[in-house]
């Protein structure tokens, strides 16, 4: 096996999904290294992380709409594959029974500036105790679970938008600076 230069080129593109690239025969016997990301890191355009083996990887994803998802492949060579792992996190899960209930839930959650994610027929959002309690009081029957947040709805505050309100609520240390990039200091 050839020794790979530990410094990779800057990652500027997502090459495809791991399962699809394996089915196409583009990934065969190469070892697969993972870059673990929190859900809020997947929105960042510029990012520096390390793989599970300690290899440093730099991302510069400047194309519109590029967002890292679980099992995205960002590097392929004859000796190595690097794929993304979105780490599971505590989430609120809603299972609306009707389209009007889905619309109301999304509207109300979006109005509170929380990022929304789709997981099949369910709506998920990062766990926040005040939000969970508000959803219970509003009759939505939320559940707490641990899941990967990866299919973000595009028209909400997690993507950033141009207005703000003078109020605050607890995001358990996660916040953004009006740019939609949630993070923790």
From Swiss-Prot:
GO terms for biological process: protein folding; protein-containing complex assembly; urea metabolic process. Belongs to the UreE family. Coiled coil: none annotated. GO terms for cellular component: cytoplasm. NCBIfam families: PRK13261.1-6. InterPro entries: UreE (IPR012406), UreE_C_dom (IPR007864), UreE_N (IPR004029), UreE_N_sf (IPR036118). The keyword rRNA-binding does not apply. Involved in urease metallocenter assembly. Binds nickel. Probably functions as a nickel donor during metallocenter assembly. Residues 176-185 have a biased composition (Basic and acidic residues). Residues 153-185 are annotated as: Disordered. The gene is ureE. This is Urease accessory protein UreE. Pfam families: UreE_C, UreE_N. It is found in: Cytoplasm. It comes from Haemophilus influenzae (strain ATCC 51907 / DSM 11121 / KW20 / Rd). Keywords: Chaperone, Cytoplasm, Nickel, Nickel insertion. GO terms for molecular function: nickel cation binding; unfolded protein binding. Residues 162-175 have a biased composition (Basic residues).
